A protein has these predicted regions:
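Broad structural signal for hydrophobic residues in well-ordered alpha-helices, predominantly aliphatic
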Residues: 35, 67-68, 99, 118
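Membrane-interface interhelical loops and short interface/amphipathic helices
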Residues: 1-10
C-alpha cells in the first residue's frame, strides 16, 4: 500500500514542486500588486484579471500534453504528465476568472465565492474542474457573452 502511494507521488512530483512554486509566485505577485495599488505607488495600471485570456496555442499545447500524459509510455509519458500538471495553472486562473465574473452577476455572489474557495481549500479536487473550465472558456468565451449581455440590459 505504502509503495503504491510512493509510486503514484513520484509520477507527478516534479510537476507538483514546479506548480507549487508557480502558485506562490502568482500569489506573491498579486499581493505585491495589491500593496502598491493601495499605497498608490503602482507604475502601471492594475490588470483586469477578470478578463484574463490566454493565447490559442496554449490550449492546443495543454490538450496535447494531457492526451500525451495518458497515451505515451515511459519517459515521454512522465514528461507529458508533469508538463500537463504545470500547464494546468494558466487554465486554472482563467477558470477562476470565469467563476468571479459569474459571481458578480448574482446577488449572493460573494457568499458563493467564499463557499467555493472553502470547498477548494478543504478538498482540492475542485481545482481540476476549474482548470478544465478554463480550458473550455478559451473556446466558448462565456465571459465575453456575459459582458455583452450585461451591456444590452
Amino acid at each position: 500500500m505504502q509503495e503504491k502511494v510512493i509510486d503514484n507521488v513520484v509520477l507527478v512530483l516534479p510537476g507538483t514542486v514546479a506548480l507549487s512554486w508557480l502558485v506562490m509566485l502568482v500569489i506573491n505577485g498579486a499581493l505585491g500588486q495589491g500593496l502598491v495599488l493601495r499605497f498608490k505607488r503602482n507604475m502601471r495600471p492594475n490588470p483586469d484579471f477578470a478578463m484574463l485570456e490566454l493565447p490559442n496555442w496554449l490550449s492546443v499545447l495543454g490538450a496535447a500534453l494531457l492526451i500525451g500524459s495518458i497515451i505515451l509510455p515511459g519517459s515521454f509519458g512522465y514528461f507529458a504528465k508533469n508538463a500537463a500538471f504545470i500547464m494546468a495553472l494558466p487554465f486554472f486562473l482563467v477558470g477562476l476568472s470565469v467563476i468571479h465574473v459569474a459571481a458578480r452577476r448574482i446577488s449572493a455572489g460573494m457568499l458563493l465565492l467564499i463557499l467555493f474557495y472553502l470547498l477548494m481549500l478543504l478538498f482540492g479536487w475542485p481545482a481540476i474542474f476549474v482548470a478544465f473550465f478554463g480550458l473550455i472558456e478559451q473556446r466558448a468565451g462565456f465571459r465575453r457573452k456575459w459582458a455583452s449581455a450585461s451591456k444590452e440590459e
